[in-house]
Regions:
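N-terminal capping/small domains of soluble enzymes
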Residues: 1-97, 102-104
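Active-site metal-binding loops of divalent metal-dependent hydrolases
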Residues: 22-23, 244-246
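Alpha-helical scaffold segments in soluble metabolic enzymes
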Residues: 32, 80, 111, 150, ...
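Short gly/pro/ser/thr-enriched loop/turn and capping motifs at secondary-structure boundaries
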Residues: 48-53, 132-134, 196-199, 270-272
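A short, charged, Gly/Pro-tolerant segment at domain boundaries
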Residues: 297-305
Length: 305
């Protein structure tokens, strides 16, 4: 019997498979298809202080080996998430959930994290620092080590639950950002967020997305995710959550060998709503194929091979 359970920031997971924020709604939508308690946990839709309608349409475009999106953090706002979404989730999901938080200022990050930290259902806070800083000229918090550290420190001072900082790959040095977050008190790092891209409409001779650019996800970015997880694992001492183009149980094993303690699955859910269940069910077979008895034994295993 293989062991799939791992521990993420002191909280146990039955397995390391975590649907990524923005691809799994608030969970209950998928609970109509299968028992989502088979998952390790999931990261729910990115939450901001105020409701957001998101970017204008079209905001999703297909591409070779992936998806381009510029949804724009559409969400009902933290008040509605706490009052409406989490109670609905509680009826179908009986494990701690990961709360993904976005903000456009330090104050917004702190307020939203503090509110969600007080919710018994929330086990982890995943802080997305890819948002533009409205008080910093629009530059993303996640592209500057000092700004990344400032968000991390401010949130950590305001909450009790583990804080996992989600990093953007659109940076010069991912390890500098990761170390800055660790030094500021982060309990974990998740990466990679989407890669900036663009597609053009040949007939209209303009971008396919109304926003112009969008975040690229799907199997095309998987090798980039493996490389960056590898680098960050070597740079920090806190747990790493790997994501970016994960489509199979083999991909989960590969990211864990690169250094991930747990693995998020994003775009695969948009292609196949049963993707995460399939990966969870297939994990024991793949473990046996590669002579893995306990997933904990392979975290970062390729660094020692």
């Amino acid at each position: 019997m293989v062991k799939t359970n791992v521990t993420l920031c002191s909280l146990p997971l039955d397995n390391p498979v975590i649907p990524a924020s923005g691809t799994f709604g608030y969970g209950y939508e998928f609970a109509e298809l299968y028992d989502i308690n088979c998952l390790g946990t999931f990261s729910f839709k990115g939450t901001t202080r105020e409701p957001r309608l998101g970017n204008p349409q079209p905001r999703i475009a297909e591409m070779q080996s992936g998806v381009l999106n510029a949804v724009g953090l559409q969400n009902p706002g933290v008040d509605a998430v706490i009052a409406e979404e989490l109670p609905r989730l509680a009826r179908v999901f009986h494990k701690p959930v990961m709360a993904n938080v976005s903000g456009f200022s330090l104050d917004e990050y702190v307020e939203v994290c503090r509110r969600l930290d007080a919710c018994p259902q929330v086990g982890w806070l995943e802080v997305n620092i890819s948002c533009p800083n409205v008080h910093g000229g629009g530059m993303s918090f996640g592209t500057d080590p000092k700004a990344a550290a400032a968000v991390t420190r401010a949130v950590k001072d305001a909450v009790k639950k583990p804080v996992i900082v989600k990093l953007s790959p659109n940076v010069t040095s991912i390890t500098d950002i990761a170390r800055a977050c660790e030094d500021a008190g982060a309990d974990g790092i998740s990466l990679i967020n989407t890669v900036m891209g663009m597609r053009l409409d040949l007939k209209a001779r303009k971008p396919l997305l109304a926003n112009g650019t969008g975040g690229m996800s799907g199997p095309a970015i998987f090798p980039l995710a493996v490389r960056m997880v590898w680098q960050v694992y070597e740079a920090v001492r806190i747990p790493v959550v790997g994501l970016g183009g994960v489509m199979s149980a083999e991909d989960v094993i590969e990211l864990m060998l690169a250094g991930a303690t747990a693995v998020e699955v994003g775009a695969a859910n948009l292609v196949d709503p049963f993707a995460c269940r399939r990966i969870v069910e297939d994990l024991p077979r793949v473990m046996q194929k590669y002579n893995i008895n306990d997933l904990n034994d392979i975290i970062g295993g390729a660094h020692h091979g």
